[in-house]
Structures are given as structure tokens and as C-alpha cells.
Amino acid sequence: MSQLLLKQLEEISKMKMFILENCPHCKRARAWIEEFKQENPIYQSIEIELIDEQVNSEVANQYDYYYVPALFDGNIKLHEGVASKEGIRKIFDKYLKNDI
């Protein structure tokens, strides 16, 4: 397999989370994610690429969302906007079961 294809496959397998640095909802969601990873090691297997939409606007513009935080698996939108702790946990559980 070519290096480019391997890199593309890696990117696909990573969850992406679009944020804004000063967004209180993004900060809360990130704190919950860290809390989940501390509580249950299975969640540590979920790789999340954090993308600040102001810093990486050219990447952010390739995805269909308006509100942050926004979570994607590949091009599939998993969540957009104000999150709840249980909502994020449900997304993670579905993601781990490949049920998305």
C-alpha cells in the first residue's frame, strides 16, 4: 500500500472534533472526553483529532456543520452543537461497537 493511502486510512479511522478555542461548550465536551478516558480505558482507544476551525478553516470548510463542538467519523456527522455528557458517552459507545 502506498504511504498516501495509509495516511488516508489513518485519517478515516480517527474521529474529528471541530472546536473554537474559547467556546465554553467545546471546553466542557473536551473535559468530559478526558473524564471518560480516565474512568474507562476502553475509551482511550478512540483517537480524536481536535481541529480549531479558526486556525484550520480550510479543513473545517470541507465538513457540513455550523455549530461547535462538532464530531465526525470520516464524513459522517456524529454530533453538532451543545453537547451533553451522556450524549457524548452514547456516541463513543456506538463508535466502539462500529454501530455508526
Q: Residue ranges of each PLM-predicted region?
A:
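Structural micro-motif
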Residues: 62-73
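Secondary-structure boundary motif
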Residues: 38-42, 97
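Thiol-based oxidoreductase modules, predominantly thioredoxin-like and allied folds used
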Residues: 43-57
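Non-catalytic, surface beta->alpha helical segment in thiol-disulfide oxidoreductase systems
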Residues: 72-100
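Residues at alpha-helix caps and immediate loop-helix transition turns in enzyme cores, especially N-
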Residues: 28-29, 64, 84
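Short alpha-helical
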Residues: 24-25, 55, 86
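Local sequence-structure signature of Cys/Sec-based thiol-disulfide redox active-site neighborhoods
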Residues: 2-39
